[in-house]
Amino acid sequence: MTTFSEKEKIQLLADIVELQTENNNEIDVCNYLKDLFDKYDIKSEILKVNEHRANIVAEIGNGSPILALSGHMDVVDAGNQDNWTYPPFQLTEKAGKLYGRGTTDMKGGLMALVITLIELKEQNQLPQGTIRLLATAGEEKEQEGAKLLADKGYLDDVDGLIIAEPTGSGIYYAHKGSMSCKVTATGKAVHSSVPFIGDNAIDTLLEFYNQFKEKYSELKKHDTKHELDVAPMFKSLIGKEISEEDANYASGLTAVCSIINGGKQFNSVPDEASLEFNVRPVPEYDNDFIESFFQNIINDVDSNKLSLDIPSNHRPVTSDKNSKLITTIKDVASSYVEQDEIFVSALVGATDASSFLGDNKDNVDLAIFGPGNPLMAHQIDEYIEKDMYLKYIDIFKEASIQYLKEK
């Protein structure tokens, strides 16, 4: 029994794909969802991050246990729209696929949760407890929306949390963190014909980088025991088992220097240069450790000429891989997905769970699970399989009922 027809479910997704939320303007989706919830007498509230960015929270039921369902409303930039086969901000159905920016990451998952909430309420299927939907702004960059909801206490009383990021047949119980670490070197600019009276910032930065590589390489030699196991994820993505050595490396700390800047013209000694790193912290080497690791190298080289800035700082999140939420989703999904395709793993990427749960001292059940092939995220001609989108609505409904009934 459903409240919405298949055609209506696809149209609801089409409606929010048309709302252009490229790293901004989530307020438009909030207003759309508020009207939709009002139509079905579901209480909801819009919480603004700023004028154009906002979250919306909606809730059905009452009392405990409390299951939170979450998805983000922002999408990444569509890039040059001329490179798309179909318009990115218009849902196009072709050969069983629904094309459009955000269909996979993650308006498909978000709308599946919205429909889940409405249909459970309309069909009076909630056995006990509360379902709280949290639609967030700004996940793709700084997680501003999730931070706001956490600060306001919307996660303080939850027993379980489903984040409907595109995971295909994967169910994730934990993930690494993500840090942006920028190291800036300062010097003295002079004409390049007299470099000896200046101070080349690039030289100082290179000294830092050489020390960083040496110490990071030494650290990785001892990074062999991990709480997070990402091997099942990689087996699914590449279609075969990865070596124990690769699994060890992938499950541990990773740090990549991804941006370098220095100098403005060839005949001047640069007075500033910078390196930016993306670091993926793990429980064994957490965010505090990473900050100290960078700062210690800066102190060794020259703290008067080098500085550290951390504009993005998301912690790794862990939960019980055998929690009631994980086992419930796995059992329900097995009726819709081939049993041998379903796997439970830790995730190398970060989600709003970092801001929602932090180090998860309260042991909230966490499941990152949603429709869409994760490899389609951020791609030109992004799409979600229509059947997957529709099936996952049913999975979310059944799993929510079972979890609240048995928790």
UniProtKB/Swiss-Prot annotation:
It comes from the Bacteria. It holds the Pfam family Peptidase_M20. The active site is at D74, E139. Keywords: Amino-acid biosynthesis, Cobalt, Diaminopimelate biosynthesis, Hydrolase, Lysine biosynthesis, Metal-binding, Zinc. Binds 2 Zn(2+) or Co(2+) ions per subunit. Zn(2+) 1 binds at H72, D105, E165. GO terms for biological process: diaminopimelate biosynthetic process; lysine biosynthetic process via diaminopimelate. Zn(2+) 2 binds at D105, E140, H378. Its EC number is 3.5.1.18. It is an enzyme of class 3 (hydrolase). The keyword Ribosomal protein does not apply. GO terms for molecular function: metal ion binding; succinyl-diaminopimelate desuccinylase activity. Its cofactor is Zn(2+); Co(2+). It catalyses: N-succinyl-(2S,6S)-2,6-diaminopimelate + H2O = (2S,6S)-2,6-diaminopimelate + succinate. Belongs to the peptidase M20A family. This is Probable succinyl-diaminopimelate desuccinylase. It comes from Staphylococcus aureus (strain N315). The gene is dapE.
